[in-house]
C-alpha cells in the first residue's frame, strides 16, 4: 500500500511483479482553493537566484513561518547558510540528517524559534507541521505530485495559504507538468 506512488516506483512494479494491480481511490491530487499560488521568474545562475529568494522573502510581510523547498540536499544547506548570513531565521531539514536532528529542527520550527525551514522533499510528505503560512519553491519540483505535496503544507484546514514557485527558463518543462 502506498498513499502516493512516484513514477519510478510504478515502473519498477511493472518490471518485477507479475500481473500487478493498481487501485486508485481518488483522482490525481490538486491544491486547496484556500492557497494563493504565484510564479516568480528568476535567473538560472545560483547566486542571482538566491538574491531573488531573499528579495522575495523580504516582500512578504505577513509570514508567520515558511518552508523553502529545494530539490537537492546540497542546495538546502547552501540556502540555509545564505539566509542566516543575511539575517533570516532559518534551519535545514533533509534526508541525510539523523532522526534526532530532524526532530529538534521540526520542534524549533513548530515553536516559532525558526521562521524559515529550508527543506528537501522529505518535509513535504507525512510530517505534521500545522499552520504554515507560506511555502516557497526555490526549485520547481521535478514531479507534479511533489508540487501538490509541497504546496499542501500551507492553507490547511481552510486557512489562507501562500505558495510561491521560483522558475527559471530551464525549469519550464517541469512547470508544464504541474
Regions found by a protein language model. Give the residues of each.
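Conserved helicase RecA-like core
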Residues: 1-178
Amino acid at each position: 500500500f502506498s498513499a502516493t506512488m512516484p513514477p519510478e516506483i510504478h515502473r519498477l512494479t511493472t518490471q518485477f511483479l507479475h500481473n500487478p494491480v493498481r487501485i486508485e481511490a481518488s483522482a490525481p491530487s490538486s491544491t486547496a482553493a484556500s492557497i494563493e499560488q504565484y510564479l516568480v521568474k528568476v535567473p538560472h545562475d545560483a547566486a542571482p537566484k538566491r538574491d531573488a529568494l531573499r528579495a522575495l522573502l523580504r516582500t512578504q510581510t505577513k509570514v508567520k513561518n515558511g518552508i523553502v523547498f529545494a530539490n537537492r540536499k546540497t542546495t538546502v544547506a547552501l540556502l540555509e547558510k545564505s539566509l542566516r548570513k543575511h539575517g533570516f531565521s532559518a534551519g535545514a531539514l533533509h534526508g541525510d540528517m539523523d532522526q534526532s536532528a530532524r526532530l529538534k529542527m521540526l520542534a524549533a520550527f513548530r515553536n516559532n524559534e525558526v521562521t524559515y525551514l529550508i527543506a528537501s522533499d522529505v518535509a513535504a510528505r507525512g510530517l505534521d507541521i500545522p499552520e504554515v503560512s507560506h511555502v516557497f519553491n526555490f526549485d520547481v519540483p521535478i514531479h507534479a505530485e511533489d508540487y501538490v505535496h509541497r504546496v499542501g503544507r500551507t492553507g490547511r484546514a481552510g486557512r489562507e495559504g501562500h505558495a510561491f514557485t521560483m522558475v527559471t527558463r530551464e525549469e519550464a518543462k517541469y512547470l508544464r507538468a504541474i
